[in-house]
């Protein structure tokens, strides 16, 4: 069955840029996300349901699933007093999860960079042409070298391929431009600095266990490019049917942080505001946003924050004016710049374009306190289309259909339950197969007459 979604009431995107950047607009977006994922008055709570479902699947993957269902199956009117069984789950699923995860991890890769810009392509082409000339004039250059001592070859003769097939291999295996080597080293340093190999293993485990994986990339002035693992149980996103989540317009994650970390991230908060946030009723109860499993690990000195990205568009408007010296002057205007056509004739013209932008926001869950709402300072854009923007969160769920996420562990939980019940039934059968005991009367043996006048 497809996932049911409670639609939130998002503000209109067809408004001015000045209105979009206002805190009031950001609070409307945050409230809509909160309503879509966290409210229970409609009979459903997507965030709570996702956390419970993923928690259950992870317990199955560890062989630590709840045994209450097995006790209910074997008990008679709830009575277990006559059963003497080992209720420990049989670790069937963990073995196959490890096999699948390790098999995926063995598919290693190396980063290879190839320059495709006009300069890099022309440089590669010129290098190939020089080698081809050396191959075609090999006999002539050898004669000139032996007869006149003149080296006419453009490249090292020891590294010269024998034919065009070897030239293709040489270009693939040995030829590297300086910019390509620098790019490969830069990517390797970023991945190693973020311990991406360890993160990749966690992603493989999540894909196998719960069917969805997520990482977040962002830029900080102190640490540069950061790639962080994100628990899929804590993310929120707009409805999508794409397994690569490439058509979502908002995404975010819930983080539980202590008060001191909140002050560190938002130093402009006063002591009075911090105290007010910590004393919010919803923040105290936590029942609106946290599962029963997570309540035990949190205290009243922690705060639930919703970090989110919101994708919308903005209008870039320019006024192009001809100067008295014959030049052209381009002046940036806001999207409300709309002079009459009569004024633009012969004096200036208006140029505009629409492009996607990301807004970043932080909401204290259960309150109307919006800690952050601004245009993202570092936005990723595809090189082929600078009007598009990419989210900071990269999510994938390969077996998703109509919003419903499927995983390997989810498909085998039924078989694991049957194996566990069979294991318990076997224990019952083995207990009934124990033969009847033999009772020996020691006093009776002492009174037996041995026939020699003694007992």
Give each language-model segment a name.
Residues 1-355, 359, 368-371:
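Extended, helix-rich architectural segments
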Residues 322-455:
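Extended, charged amphipathic alpha-helical segments
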């Amino acid at each position: 069955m497809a996932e049911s979604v409670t639609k939130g009431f998002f503000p209109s995107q067809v408004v001015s840029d000045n209105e979009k950047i206002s805190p009031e607009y950001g609070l409307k977006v945050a409230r809509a996300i909160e309503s879509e994922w966290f409210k229970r008055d409609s009979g459903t709570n997507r965030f709570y349901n996702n956390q419970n479902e993923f928690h259950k699947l992870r317990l199955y993957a560890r062989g630590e699933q709840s045994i209450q269902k097995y006790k209910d199956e074997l008990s008679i009117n709830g009575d277990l007093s006559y059963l003497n069984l080992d209720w420990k789950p049989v670790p069937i699923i963990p073995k196959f999860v490890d096999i699948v995860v390790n098999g995926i991890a063995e598919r290693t890769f190396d980063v290879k960079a190839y320059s495709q810009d006009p300069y890099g392509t022309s440089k590669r082409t010129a290098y190939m042409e020089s080698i081809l000339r050396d191959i075609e004039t090999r006999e002539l250059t050898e004669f000139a070298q032996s007869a006149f001592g003149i080296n006419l070859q453009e490249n090292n003769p020891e590294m010269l391929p024998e034919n065009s097939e070897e030239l293709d291999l040489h270009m693939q295996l040995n030829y590297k431009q300086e910019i390509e080597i620098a790019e490969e080293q830069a990517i390797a340093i970023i991945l190693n600095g973020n311990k991406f190999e360890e993160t990749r293993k966690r992603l493989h485990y999540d894909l196998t266990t719960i069917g969805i994986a997520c990482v977040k990339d962002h830029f900080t002035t102190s640490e540069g490019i950061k790639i962080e693992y994100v628990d899929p149980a804590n993310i929120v996103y707009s409805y999508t049917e794409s397994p690569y989540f490439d058509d979502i317009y908002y995404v975010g994650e819930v983080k539980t942080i202590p008060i001191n970390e909140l002050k560190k991230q938002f130093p402009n908060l006063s002591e009075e505001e911090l105290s007010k946030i910590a004393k919010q009723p919803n923040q105290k109860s936590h029942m609106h946003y946290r599962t029963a499993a997570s309540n035990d690990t949190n205290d009243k000195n922690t705060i639930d924050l919703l970090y989110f990205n919101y994708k919308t568009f903005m209008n870039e408007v320019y006024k192009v004016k001809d100067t008295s010296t014959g030049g052209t002057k381009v002046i940036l205007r806001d999207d409300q710049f709309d002079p009459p056509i009569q004024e633009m004739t012969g004096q200036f013209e208006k140029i505009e374009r629409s492009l996607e932008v990301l807004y970043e926001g932080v909401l204290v869950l259960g309150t109307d306190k919006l800690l952050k709402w601004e245009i993202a300072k570092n936005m990723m854009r595809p090189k082929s289309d600078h009007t598009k923007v990419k989210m900071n969160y990269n999510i994938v769920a390969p077996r998703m259909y109509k919003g419903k996420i499927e995983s390997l562990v989810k498909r085998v939980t039924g078989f694991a339950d049957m194996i566990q019940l069979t294991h318990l039934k076997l224990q019952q059968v083995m207990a009934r197969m124990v033969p009847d005991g033999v009772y020996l009367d020691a006093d009776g043996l002492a009174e037996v007459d041995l026939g020699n006048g003694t007992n």
